[in-house]
Regions:
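Bacterial Sec signal peptide processing site at the extreme N-terminus
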Residues: 18-44
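Bacterial N-terminal signal peptides that target proteins for export
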Residues: 1-13
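Gly/Pro-biased beta-strand-loop elements
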Residues: 50-163, 194, 211-213, 217-218
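Short, basic/aromatic beta-hairpin or loop at an interaction surface
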Residues: 58-60, 173-181
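A generic structural signal for well-ordered coil/turn residues at beta-strand boundaries
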Residues: 147-148, 179, 199
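Short, solvent-exposed aromatic-acidic interface loops
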Residues: 100-102, 168-171
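N-terminal targeting pre-sequences for secretion and organelle import
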Residues: 183, 188-219
Length: 219
C-alpha cells in the first residue's frame, strides 16, 4: 500500500494548481476506438467476465483545454474530480474519467512512470486478503484481473511508490470513490493511455481536499 501522509510538493501549492483545472471549459468527446488493440486485447475484451457499463458522458474520454504548464507527455491525476489528464501540445489534454480507490488517497506529489505492463498479474497484499479475500497468492493477467489490461507503476527517487494507474474489471465505478485500489480506468482508456505514455514520463498527483471526501468511499 502507498505510504501514508507523503507528498512531494506543498499542499497549498498543489491545491492551488488544481484549481486551475476549472478553466478546462471547452471539451470535445473522443470516442473509444479498438484501432490500437493487440490480438490479445481483442480476445480478452470480446466477451469480458463483467457487465459492460454505461459510463456517464462526463467521465468518457474528452479532448479539453488545459491551462496548466506541464509539458506534453505529462500525466496529471485529480483525485477529487476523478479525472486523469494526459497533456498534449498547444494547450490541450486528453481527459479520462477514473475510479479512485482508498490507496490512491494515500500519496500525492510528483513521480515518474518507472515500469509499464500489459495484462499484468496481480499479487494481493495481506491487507487486501484480510479485508476482501480470500484470493490466490497471484492472479494471472486477464479480463477478470482487478488490474485490467494495463498498469503504470509510479516511482519516486528510483523507488516504487506502490501507486498504480491501471485498468479494471469493475467499469461501473468509473467516476466514483471506492474502498480499494489505486487509480482505475476502463480497459479501453488505459490501453489508449498506455500507448501514449513513455517510461520515465512525469506524473503529477494532486492531493485530495483537506476537508475529506463528501460521501466517503464505496465498497
Amino acid at each position: 500500500m502507498p505510504r501514508r501522509g507523503r507528498t512531494s510538493l506543498p499542499w497549498g501549492l498543489l491545491g492551488l494548481l488544481g484549481v486551475l483545472l476549472g478553466g478546462c471549459m471547452q471539451t470535445t468527446l473522443a470516442p473509444s476506438s479498438q484501432a490500437n488493440f493487440t490480438p490479445r486485447d481483442r480476445q480478452q475484451l470480446a466477451h469480458p467476465p463483467y457487465a459492460r457499463a454505461s459510463i456517464p458522458e462526463t467521465y468518457q474520454r474528452h479532448i479539453v483545454d488545459y491551462q496548466r504548464r506541464e509539458r506534453p507527455g505529462t500525466i496529471l491525476v485529480d483525485t477529487d474530480a476523478r479525472f486523469l489528464y494526459y497533456v498534449l501540445p498547444q494547450g490541450k489534454a486528453i481527459r479520462y474519467g477514473v475510479a479512485v480507490g482508498e490507496e490512491a488517497m494515500a500519496w500525492s506529489g510528483v513521480a515518474t512512470v518507472g515500469r509499464m505492463s500489459e495484462w499484468p498479474d496481480w499479487i494481493p497484499t495481506r491487507e487486501i486478503q484480510e479485508r476482501l479475500g480470500p484470493y490466490p497468492s497471484r492472479v494471472a493477467g486477464g479480463a477478470a484481473n482487478p488490474l485490467g489490461a494495463r498498469a503504470l507503476y509510479l516511482y519516486e527517487g528510483g523507488k516504487d511508490t506502490l501507486y498504480r494507474i491501471h485498468g479494471t474489471n469493475q467499469p461501473e465505478y468509473i467516476g466514483q470513490a471506492i474502498s480499494s485500489g489505486c487509480i482505475r480506468m476502463t480497459n479501453e482508456d488505459v490501453i489508449d493511455l498506455f500507448d501514449r505514455v513513455r517510461p520515465g514520463a512525469t506524473v503529477v498527483v494532486l492531493p485530495p481536499s483537506r476537508g475529506g471526501w463528501a460521501g466517503g468511499f464505496r465498497s
